[in-house]
């Protein structure tokens, strides 16, 4: 997946891999180490403790913290993590912490809101940011970023183009303000595919690295990196008229063979997946989840599937 996405950008464009939330629910250290070996230039995490985990696992390339919090500024600095600063209060607090730690020109990224309306400075705040930056030497702005709202949606091309126009204007003003070459990054996975002209100096990819590109044409080039599997714990022959599971939400119309699988709510399979709404796969055949999903068990209908206790099941 990395090689495919890498092939879509210019050789000189840096690649940032997003490994927040335990690398999207997998293994952040293992994923990051592999990507570091492949040549990834940067990593991004949501919180400082995730960055510390990567450093402890042997990651040496720069790590961007997308949601830096005042309580963790010292840990962030101690582990050479780069904060994405998105408000004047966060900027002021981080400068103060950096001064207290006695550091000079600590690298920071400035995040601007161009339309997602989640986190970020407004363009109008740039003069105030400049004053804060130029009256100290504890931190140094090295990058400008923003986040696009709908790069995967072809119906939102006009809005994405507007966001890119806003970002471009901010970048030009920032270059003039700080008088240095700033690293600029705005594209996400779908942006890499649909807006290649806006690569700037670096692109960011999260979901694409794990095998999903938000569009069938992209997904066909990607491979999901994880599969949830279990085994059949027990099979039952259920007579017609018998119920299965809590609240008797399934009643057999005829003699039915069921299989119980040892996973459920605790593994992220909510009740909305039960009562025949979704399926699991056994030897390439689909079996519906019947009844209510339990905390650590689900029941499936295997009446027409040849299978045995201990057989592998793909969720």
Question: Where in this protein do the model-derived segments appear?
Answer:
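Positively charged, low-complexity intrinsically disordered leader regions
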Residues: 1-6, 10
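Active-site anion/phosphate-binding pocket segments in diverse small-molecule metabolic enzymes
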Residues: 33, 49-50, 68-71, 75, ...
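Secondary-structure boundary/capping motif
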Residues: 6, 60, 107, 255-256, ...
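Active-site-proximal beta-alpha core segment in soluble small-molecule metabolic enzymes
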Residues: 11-183
């Amino acid at each position: 997946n990395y090689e495919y996405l890498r092939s879509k950008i210019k050789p000189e464009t840096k690649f940032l891999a997003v490994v927040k939330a335990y690398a999207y629910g997998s293994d952040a250290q293992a994923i990051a180490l592999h990507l570091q070996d492949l040549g990834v230039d940067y990593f991004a995490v949501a919180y400082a403790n995730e960055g510390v985990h990567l450093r402890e696992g042997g990651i040496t390339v720069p790590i961007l913290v997308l949601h830096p919090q005042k309580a963790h500024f010292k840990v962030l600095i101690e582990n050479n993590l780069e904060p994405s600063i998105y408000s004047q209060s966060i900027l002021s607090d981080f400068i103060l912490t950096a001064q207290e730690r006695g550091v000079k020109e600590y690298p920071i990224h400035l995040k601007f809101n161009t339309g997602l309306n989640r986190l970020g400075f407004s363009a109008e705040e740039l003069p105030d940011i400049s004053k804060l930056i130029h009256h100290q030497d504890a931190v140094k702005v090295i990058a400008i970023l923003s986040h696009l709202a709908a790069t995967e949606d072809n119906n939102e091309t006009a809005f994405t183009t507007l966001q890119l126009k806003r970002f471009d204007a901010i970048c030009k003003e920032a270059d003039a303000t700080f008088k240095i070459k700033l690293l600029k990054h705005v594209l996400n996975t779908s942006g890499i595919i649909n807006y290649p002209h806006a690569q700037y100096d670096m692109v960011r990819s999260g979901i694409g690295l794990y095998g999903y590109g938000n569009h069938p044409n992209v997904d066909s080039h990607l491979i999901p990196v994880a599969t949830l599997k279990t085994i059949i714990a027990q099979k039952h022959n259920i007579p017609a008229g018998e119920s299965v599971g809590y609240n008797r939400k399934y009643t057999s119309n005829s003699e039915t063979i069921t299989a119980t699988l040892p996973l459920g709510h605790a593994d992220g399979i909510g009740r909305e997946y039960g009562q025949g709404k979704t399926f699991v796969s056994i030897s390439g055949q689909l079996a519906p989840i019947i009844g209510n999903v339990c905390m650590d068990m689900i029941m499936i209908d295997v009446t027409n599937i040849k299978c045995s206790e201990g057989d592998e099941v793909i969720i």
